[in-house]
Amino acid sequence: MTVEWLAEQLKEHNIQLTETQKQQFQTYYRLLVEWNEKMNLTSITDEHDVYLKHFYDSIAPSFYFDFNQPISICDVGAGAGFPSIPLKIMFPQLKVTIVDSLNKRIQFLNHLASELQLQDVSFIHDRAETFGKGVYRESYDVVTARAVARLSVLSELCLPLVKKGGQFVALKSSKGEEELEEAKFAISVLGGNVTETHTFELPEDAGERQMFIIDKKRQTPKKYPRKPGTPNKTPLLEK
């Protein structure tokens, strides 16, 4: 009864899973495994591991950041929808946009959202570098990303999308602190300021996680993000 395990874990953080939410997570797992057979969405397919390392891991940021408010979230490179779809299931009032460079993942997300009957979600097939130059630049309350690149690179992809006064919530595994040191220059150049750092353990010794909350204090200079591929090849680092 893996969804019951998730419910028990969340109860320890004063979060109650409704019957509807339980059904949504069960459907999410079923579709993830079905679609994963025809496209590579995740290397984690064991049911308990998905609930622990994808679902619980995606919801854990809400222990430290208030997602229970009507805010717009952009999730950069969410793959199979992590963390934003589990957060949307838990906090239905969120307005969620996912940007991903692989169209097959967007097809999965569209089908998933339809099956889960999610409202106020949109999935955009684009590179984050291009998306951050367009009409959505500096338009989101919160931008999130879960370990898709080093923090110096992620900051250039994500901070341009955050509105002034909003937050970039970066989710990393255990090496986050050294990445944060390296990324401080880029964060400052891009208009951000690190305001909170949280370190926590997943249940069952499944690993350490770090979460950085970066406030958007100033507008990002127009030249950022640079053209696709450049942030990854030559990250913004202090010379």
UniProtKB/Swiss-Prot annotation:
Region named Disordered: 215-239
Residues annotated for S-adenosyl-L-methionine binding in this entry: 77, 82, 128-129, 146
Similarity comment text for this entry: Belongs to the methyltransferase superfamily. RNA methyltransferase RsmG family.
The entry's keywords: Cytoplasm, Methyltransferase, rRNA processing, S-adenosyl-L-methionine, Transferase
Described function: Specifically methylates the N7 position of guanine in position 535 of 16S rRNA.
HAMAP family to which the protein is assigned, alphabetical: 16SrRNA_methyltr_G
Organism: Staphylococcus aureus (strain NCTC 8325 / PS 47)
GO molecular function terms listed in the Swiss-Prot or TrEMBL record: rRNA (guanine-N7-)-methyltransferase activity
Catalytic EC class: transferase
Domain of life of the source: Bacteria
Keyword Ribosomal protein annotated: no
This protein's record includes keyword S-adenosyl-L-methionine: yes
Broad class of the protein's primary localization: cytoplasm
Pfam families named among the record's database cross-references: GidB
Localization (cell): Cytoplasm
Coiled coil: none
CDD domains named among the record's database cross-references: AdoMet_MTases
EC numbers: 2.1.1.-
Annotated protein name in UniProt: Ribosomal RNA small subunit methyltransferase G
InterPro entries: rRNA_ssu_MeTfrase_G, SAM-dependent_MTases_sf
GO terms under cellular component: cytosol
Membrane-spanning parts: none
